[in-house]
Amino acid sequence: MLKTLLLWTAVGVAGAAQAAPNLARHADLDLATARQLADATLKHCTGALSVLDRGGNVLMAQRPEGVGPHNLLASQRKAYTALSTKTPTRLFAERARNNPEAANLNSIAELLLLGGGVPLFAEGELVGALGVAGAGGAEQDEACAIQATGQVGLTIQR
């Protein structure tokens, strides 16, 4: 009886191990890299910044003294827009302006169609996003985000 019980237990465990799904593994943006991005951003400009992970969660948010308080939320929304669309926000805003069907995108509260948000890719995989606001305008915000991204070894395209 004990041998039979042990045999069925072994078969059940082996079967359970084989039935486990083969889930994909993904690179994750960690807090250390988010800090590096923040430091790199502030080397290139003085603006508020937000770093999001692949799920849209804030890993790092910072607003230097003298930068308007509204810019922190703007940086987060720019990062969220870049993450959601997998596109730099200035390019996305330009495309939206040229497409009448995209006019309603401005009504989605979480999106901000202004330059300064960039998706973050590691070896072709989306790992998060960086948003910059208050550095002197959309072009400056975007340039700052792109420079910081390159400095830490990430890219803004697949």
Indicate residue ranges for each PLM-predicted region.
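Flexible, solvent-exposed loop/hinge segments and secondary-structure transition points
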Residues: 19-158
